[in-house]
Amino acid sequence: MATPKAKVSKSRRDKRRAQFTARSKAAETVTCPNCGEPTLPHRACRHCGHYRGRAVTKKSSNS
């Protein structure tokens, strides 16, 4: 297996991780077909609790 030639500092490590998070979160959002709120793909809606047409978490049904 490959081994690192030098220790990666905490600052350099955190800068690399910050770029990944910024790109992945901002680019991919879809609208929930049940309530219309933006949500992450392939996950239950945080506002209404629906996923693929089913209520998977208990939320208020006032949407």
From Swiss-Prot:
SUPFAM superfamilies recorded: Zn-binding ribosomal proteins (SSF57829)
Coiled-coil ranges from the UniProt annotation: none
Keyword Ribosomal protein assigned: yes
Annotated region described as Disordered, given as residue ranges: 1-23
Basic residues biased stretches: 7-18
Gene Ontology biological-process entries: translation
Top-level division of the source organism's lineage: Bacteria
GO MF term set: structural constituent of ribosome
Example of a GO cellular component annotation carried by this entry: large ribosomal subunit
Keywords (A to Z) from UniProt: Ribonucleoprotein, Ribosomal protein
Keyword Ribosomal protein included in the entry's annotation: yes
Family: Belongs to the bacterial ribosomal protein bL32 family.
Protein name: Large ribosomal subunit protein bL32
Higher taxonomy: Bacteria, Pseudomonadati, Chlorobiota, Chlorobiia, Chlorobiales
